[in-house]
């Protein structure tokens, strides 16, 4: 009990104590370090709005709460956008730096994902109280989002592959971020299908399925790399483990998109992709596939939660970072997919489970918002040396695995491996005991 008390005391000083303020730095200088990761907050806020809009067990006023969250998201997005604009105008070099930085460029995806939730909530909260013009607004925003997210995805991965060479040791769940925005196109198509006429919905559904599949397959590739990292290197530092919830999002959102898109196809008149007698089969297949991949999302959710809690109750340092909003957004897909599966198979248990997890996420969001405000006010965020832009680039993977790099830049461990490979490709004497761990 004594050790547990000491750990909790340490966590209090790291996460809740207000008497740990760093030296004062003018706000204009702090905004130089206002990185893209701040949009993870608006991404999560939009996700909470989506959860509130999908709760199966509702009470009077819940829709009003959802609209308040929607307005809050718009306010925060405008505020963060203004801060980012100030940063780029005051410090023009940060425009290029933010794109070329090995970590910060990944978080540009959180800005796009915030916009995706904005479009989703237009259909939930704005469309019922507006006119025909909202149908056009949603459709135009959707196609703009599709184009921008795909361009970002391609260019982000190209820059990563071209400028940064990673090792298994540096594998991170954040690698999945660039594929998230195009993947969410399927979720948006499913969310807005009730607002669009059939002849327009068909094209939106095609793009949605296409990009949802793209996102899911790329996710599987990157997920495998991260699992290999866990096997060979172990889990990340406790402070970085909330990022593991990123693995929950793609399978959960894919299941959600399949069900919602199928429901839109079945309910449209005239029918799209289905006939009068085949709608029920489309619903069955989509639900079947959603359940098939839901298990992966549930496993990733449990693994991430256990890993974080195990790290929380250690003496390893634990400081809040904007990346902690990964607790929320990926799990939004898990909650909504669970609820929709429950509706399709008429299971109150599934719906109740999704509802409970959704309530927990709303509570987590409130706590994370508090931690974010506290971290900013005590100079733990948006402060020189404490944000993503201060992270050093990964060491290049060289030697045997990548002989195109100059030998003098090879990490020491790989240089040792390389000394035991002959010029003809054959192996020389086995390494000595001091190198056996390499």
UniProtKB/Swiss-Prot annotation:
The Phosphoserine modification is found at 413, 423, 428, 432-433, 437
Compartmental location: Membrane
Q: What is this protein called?
A: Malic acid transport protein
Q: Which InterPro entries match?
A: Mae1, SLAC1/Mae1/Ssu1/TehA, TehA/Mae1, Voltage-dep_anion_channel_sf
A GO molecular function annotation here is: malate transmembrane transporter activity
Q: Which GO terms describe its cellular component?
A: plasma membrane
Indicate the family of this protein: Belongs to the tellurite-resistance/dicarboxylate transporter (TDT) family.
The membrane-topology field of this record reads: Multi-pass membrane protein
Q: Which Pfam families match?
A: SLAC1
- Please give the function described in this protein's UniProt entry: Permease for malate and other C4 dicarboxylic acids.
Which stretches does the entry tag as region Disordered?
390-438
Q: Please, one GO biological process term?
A: succinate import across plasma membrane
Q: Which UniProt keywords apply?
A: Membrane, Phosphoprotein, Transmembrane, Transmembrane helix, Transport
**Name of the coding gene:** mae1
Primary location recorded for the protein, binned into one broad class: membrane
Transmembrane region(s): 37-57, 65-85, 106-126, 140-160, 172-192, 205-225, 242-262, 288-308, 321-341, 353-373
């Amino acid at each position: 009990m004594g050790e547990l008390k000491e750990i909790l005391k340490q966590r209090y000083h790291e996460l809740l104590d207000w008497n740990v303020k760093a030296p004062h730095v003018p706000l204009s200088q702090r905004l130089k370090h206002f990185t893209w990761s701040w949009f993870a907050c608006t991404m999560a806020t939009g996700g909470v709005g989506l959860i509130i809009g999908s709760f199966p067990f509702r009470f009077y006023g819940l829709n009003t709460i959802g609209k308040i969250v929607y307005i809050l998201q718009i306010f925060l997005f405008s505020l963060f956008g203004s801060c980012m604009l100030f940063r780029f105008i005051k410090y023009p070099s940060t425009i290029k730096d933010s794109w070329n930085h090995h970590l910060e460029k990944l978080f540009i995806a959180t800005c796009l994902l915030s916009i995706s939730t904005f479009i989703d909530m237009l259909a939930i909260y704005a469309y019922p109280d507006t006119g025909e013009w909202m149908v056009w607004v949603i459709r135009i925003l959707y196609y703009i989002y599709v184009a921008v997210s795909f361009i970002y995805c391609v260019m982000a991965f190209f820059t990563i592959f071209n400028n940064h060479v990673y090792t298994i040791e540096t594998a991170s769940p954040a690698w999945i971020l660039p594929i998230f925005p195009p993947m969410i196109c399927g979720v948006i198509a499913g969310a807005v299908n009730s607002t669009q006429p059939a002849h327009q919905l068909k094209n939106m559904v095609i793009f949605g399925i296409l990009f949802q599949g793209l996102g899911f397959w790329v996710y599987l590739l990157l997920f495998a790399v991260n699992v290999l990292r866990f096997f060979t290197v172990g889990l990340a530092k406790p402070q970085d483990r909330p990022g593991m919830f990123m693995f929950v999002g793609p399978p959960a959102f894919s299941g959600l998109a399949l069900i919602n898109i199928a429901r839109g196809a079945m309910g449209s008149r005239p029918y799209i992709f289905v006939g009068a007698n085949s709608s029920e089969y489309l619903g069955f297949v989509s639900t079947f596939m959603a359940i098939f991949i839901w298990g992966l999302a549930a496993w990733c959710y449990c693994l991430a939660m256990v890993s974080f809690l195990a790290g929380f109750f250690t003496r390893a340092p634990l400081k809040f970072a904007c990346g902690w909003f990964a607790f929320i957004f990926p799990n939004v897909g898990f909650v909504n997919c669970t609820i929709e599966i429950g509706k399709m198979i008429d299971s109150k248990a599934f719906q109740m489970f999704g509802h409970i997890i959704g309530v927990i996420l709303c509570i987590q969001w409130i706590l994370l918002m508090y931690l974010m405000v506290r971290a900013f006010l005590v100079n733990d965020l948006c402060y020189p040396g404490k944000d993503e832009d201060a992270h050093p680039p990964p060491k290049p993977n060289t030697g045997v695995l990548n002989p195109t790099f100059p030998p003098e830049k090879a990490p020491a461990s790989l240089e040792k491996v390389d000394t035991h490979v002959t010029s003809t490709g054959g192996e020389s004497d086995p390494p000595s005991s001091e190198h056996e761990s390499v």
